[in-house]
From Swiss-Prot:
Gene: Gja1
Keyword Transcription: no
Annotated TM spans: 24-44, 77-97, 156-176, 208-228
Gene Ontology cellular-component annotations: apical plasma membrane; cell junction; cell-cell junction; connexin complex; contractile muscle fiber; cytoplasm; cytosol; endoplasmic reticulum
InterPro entries named among the record's database cross-references: Alpha_helix_dom_sf (IPR035091), Connexin (IPR000500), Connexin43 (IPR002261), Connexin43_C (IPR013124), Connexin_C (IPR034634), Connexin_CCC (IPR019570), Connexin_CS (IPR017990), Connexin_N (IPR013092)
Protein name per the record: Gap junction alpha-1 protein
Annotated membrane topology: Multi-pass membrane protein
Function according to Swiss-Prot or TrEMBL: Gap junction protein that acts as a regulator of bladder capacity. A gap junction consists of a cluster of closely packed pairs of transmembrane channels, the connexons, through which materials of low MW diffuse from one cell to a neighboring cell. Negative regulator of bladder functional capacity: acts by enhancing intercellular electrical and chemical transmission, thus sensitizing bladder muscles to cholinergic neural stimuli and causing them to contract. May play a role in cell growth inhibition through the regulation of NOV expression and localization.
Deletion phenotype: Mutant mice die shortly after birth.
Biased composition (Low complexity): 362-374
GO biological process: adult heart development; atrial ventricular junction remodeling; blood vessel morphogenesis; bone development; bone remodeling; cardiac conduction; cell communication by chemical coupling; cell communication by electrical coupling
Source organism of the structure: Mus musculus
GO MF annotation: an example: glutathione transmembrane transporter activity
Length: 382
């Protein structure tokens, strides 16, 4: 027969995108069909017409009797069977190549969007859409293609068509030949003058090969049915698993992420904290009574108290004249208070500081005590 290398290379690529049952089916196809057909079976049927003899001298009688007994050669019939049962697998391979081509386009587009993202362009929605498309096509990391969606449907359809072709060819073979060969065939057909007997060479050997190919066809059909049930139950299992842990819940393509890592501090001004009512370092049993954070008087108090605190601190440092004892900027901590209309303005320019986590229990200095005891015209009455 002809060269099977082209078909073999194509079918070999399917193994990377098939299930375990599909790989076994391909092994059976390669070893017990293509290899056996190209070596032993072809030599056994090589002289089928030349060794076909009839007990008549009438010209043309042997030809018409051979045509009646064997409308198509067994070898050519099995070649057609292999081609037909391989076509659905090749169509599935074409779908895999289509998905891989889609993957290349999506990866290229994703790289372009990431380059635009580095320039400050907001492309988060487009990147999420690309992730959804990859999931839809069954594309995973490192170029791996998972059987999902349209690819899974194509695979199931290919299994169904392979099974149908196997059954159809078995029925056709049984209708034309049966599953055994006789040593003598009786023929009565023009131009034969009368009923003649025709003799077949090596009928027992050919019958053994026919039975062997029949068993291989039945094994392939059984593998197709088993694989069909396996893919069906695996799809149901993945669907149930997907409902319990859906894709959008794990990736969240359109839902904004929540920032749960913000620090929580206590505010000792009678107003509520923007993040938490109590400091994580507060002693056990400690409770802080806070006011309503939406209260306008509370917000005004926050701003005025912050300005007054910094004014008192600057005046105290100026009176002391001790530049070496000035607290470094890394240890200074302003107060941060919520504002529903807009973010709180920075009080000290160039210093982005954090709110106090705990109350400083150190005693006040003597200069600070004298400075704080003097009344100032701009002091707040609290």
């Amino acid at each position: 027969m002809g060269d099977w290398s082209a078909l073999g290379k194509l079918l070999d690529k399917v193994q990377a995108y098939s299930t375990a049952g599909g790989k076994v089916w391909l092994s059976v196809l390669f070893i017990f069909r293509i290899l056996l057909l190209g070596t032993a079976v072809e030599s056994a049927w090589g002289d089928e017409q030349s060794a076909f003899r009839c007990n008549t001298q009438q010209p043309g009688c042997e030809n018409v009797c051979y045509d009646k007994s064997f409308p198509i050669s067994h070898v050519r019939f099995w070649v057609l069977q292999i081609i037909f049962v391989s076509v659905p697998t090749l169509l599935y391979l074409a779908h895999v190549f289509y998905v891989m081509r889609k993957e290349e386009k999506l990866n290229k587009k994703e790289e372009e969007l990431k380059v635009a993202q580095t320039d400050g362009v907001n492309v988060e929605m487009h990147l999420k859409q690309i992730e959804i498309k990859k999931f839809k096509y069954g594309i995973e990391e490192h170029g791996k293609v998972k059987m999902r969606g349209g690819l899974l449907r194509t695979y199931i359809i290919s299994i169904l068509f392979k099974s149908v072709f196997e059954v159809a060819f078995l029925l056709i073979q049984w209708y034309i030949y049966g599953f055994s060969l006789s040593a003598v065939y009786t023929c009565k057909r023009d131009p034969c003058p009368h009923q003649v007997d025709c003799f077949l060479s090596r009928p027992t050997e050919k019958t053994i090969f026919i039975i062997f190919m029949l068993v291989v066809s039945l094994v392939s059909l059984a593998l197709n049915i088993i694989e069909l049930f396996y893919v069906f139950f695996k799809g149901v299992k993945d669907r149930v698993k997907g409902r319990s842990d859906p894709y959008h819940a794990t990736t969240g393509p359109l839902s904004p992420s929540k920032d749960c890592g913000s620090p929580k501090y206590a505010y000792f001004n009678g107003c509520s904290s923007p993040t938490a009512p109590l400091s994580p370092m507060s002693p056990p049993g400690y409770k802080l009574v806070t006011g309503d954070r939406n209260n306008s008087s509370c917000r005004n108090y926050n701003k005025q108290a912050s300005e007054q605190n910094w004014a008192n601190y600057s005046a105290e440092q100026n009176r002391m004249g001790q530049a070496g004892s000035t607290i470094s900027n890394s240890h200074a901590q302003p107060f941060d208070f919520p504002d529903d209309s807009q973010n709180a303005k920075k009080v000290a320019a160039g210093h982005e500081l954090q709110p106090l986590a705990i109350v400083d229990q150190r005693p006040s200095s003597r200069a600070s005590s004298r400075a704080s005891s003097r009344p100032r015209p701009d002091d707040l009455e609290i």
